[in-house]
Amino acid sequence: IYKVYQRMQAHFPQIGNVKITFKKNIPFGAGLGGGSSDAAHMAIALNEIFQLGLTKEQLAEEVRPLGADCPFFVYNTPCYAEGIGDKLMPISLDLSGLRLVMIKPHCGVSTKEAYGGIIPKGTSKVLNNLKDLKVLNVLNDLTILSTLTNDFEETVCKVHPEIAEIKQRLLDAGAV
């Protein structure tokens, strides 16, 4: 949060002193982008408070150097991501008929640990077609959603097998 403040104050001298009260409800090490969302929302708040008039694209550029996934939280909507997760295209995804269950085991996975085990495999056929799926508006089809994969899963589950066990139990219970 402070890095965002410093960075934006350097770019926009009209940003004055601020008093920040911060309450965090996102668990650490859960892969939910807590620090990145904090950075993005600090930039959004400074933009509003000091009436900077920055677009989402400009705000995304401001926070991009602080973390590859920071721009995602500026958009605050499901997105198709390319590159290192910083090139974004908003997509329509209706999950209104589904229940979301979040389970945070005792183990935690740092961003460095998660990214450290990823071996680029090239773009999958599903990912090549994801932009087309957006156009066809079929991303809400559960059979399509079930074909998407999480690139972090293999690495994280090797280090923390309890995560693989939790996932399997959810799938056995009918999760998508």
Regions found by a protein language model. Give the residues of each.
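DPxDG-like acidic metal-binding loop motif
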Residues: A30-K56, F72
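Conserved, helical-rich catalytic subdomain that frames metal- and/or nucleotide-binding sites
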Residues: Y75-N76, Y80-V176
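Glycine/threonine-rich beta-strand-loop-alpha-helix active-site module
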Residues: Q51-I91
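A generic structural signal for short beta-strands and their flanking turns/coil linkers
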Residues: G16-V18, A68, T77, R99
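Phosphate-handling active-site elements
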Residues: A10-K19, A45-P65
